[in-house]
Amino acid sequence: MKEKIVIALGGNAIQTKEATAEAQQTAIRRAMQNLKPLFDSPARIVISHGNGPQIGSLLIQQAKSNSDTTPAMPLDTCGAMSQGMIGYWLETEINRILTEMNSDRTVGTIVTRVEVDKDDPRFNNPTKPIGPFYTKEEVEELQKEQPDSVFKEDAGRGYRKVVASPLPQSILEHQLIRTLADGKNIVIACGGGGIPVIKKENTYEGVEAVIDKDFASEKLATLIEADTLMILTNVENVFINFNEPNQQQIDDIDVATLKKYAAQGKFAEGSMLPKIEAAIRFVESGENKKVIITNLEQAYEALIGNKGTHIHM
């Protein structure tokens, strides 16, 4: 099992009712125990992860402490903060496991920038809510300072800022990530979908956006020529007609059939559909590519073919 694998961790890997650092580290410790058999295998491993709750907390902290002396940091910088924070937690727990196994593998985090197209039409239709809730009066004041920002009412709970979710075009650090992964290193990258940047003259500039982590993980897997993209979520298998009387579990499926189901609206938008779309793109990116969708607990069993949904040409 010497294949190269990108493991896209779902938010449930760090999910906890408590928002303290200690509670989140405990959740990560439990999560990484499920991946221990993979760390003990010859597989070359890159791990991506979500950051929704963590960046949400960071943005609230920024808003509450914003002043002339402690100005709030922008979204792209908060994304970098969350990558470092979660990467540190993951490194700590993975290193603990590697030490217990007397492994000579190492683990490290790459703060990852993801290039997006400044002309992506998704910039004209911001949909991703971020940060704290505001009253209507607070929004009116904020828009005097941020005339280009968009705020939307959120299910009667107040108003939230919404930002675009452009498609990833490239992963700027992909060559470095590939070099590290092709050694004995376990690499943590593309946290929270990566930091969105646009090309500007001879450099890159951060933009206020959120990249879907499944799309970013697919782009990373393609660029580093991974063999397998494993998307870990909160269900053991993909289902068509999920949570309906006629739901049907999928164990093994080809891309052509998967496309047909997606076109028929068999997968929920905003939850399973992006994972399906990312899976299709990756499988079609080269020969003998496969995608596994399952939950964290079944990750190793899915990798050896016993569990999960397996997607291929």
Swiss-Prot record:
Subcellular location: Cytoplasm
GO MF assignments: ATP binding; carbamate kinase activity
UniProt superkingdom: Bacteria
Similarity remark: Belongs to the carbamate kinase family.
InterPro entries: AceGlu_kinase-like_sf, Asp/Glu/Uridylate_kinase, Carb_kinase
Alphabetic keyword roster: Arginine metabolism, ATP-binding, Cytoplasm, Kinase, Nucleotide-binding, Transferase
Catalytic activity: hydrogencarbonate + NH4(+) + ATP = carbamoyl phosphate + ADP + H2O + H(+)
Chief site of localization: cytoplasm
Metabolic or biological pathway: Metabolic intermediate metabolism; carbamoyl phosphate degradation; CO(2) and NH(3) from carbamoyl phosphate: step 1/1
Protein's recorded name: Carbamate kinase 2
GO biological-process terms attached to the record: arginine deiminase pathway
Keyword Transcription regulation appears in the UniProt entry: no
GO cellular component: cytosol
EC number: 2.7.2.2
Keyword Nucleotide-binding set for record: yes
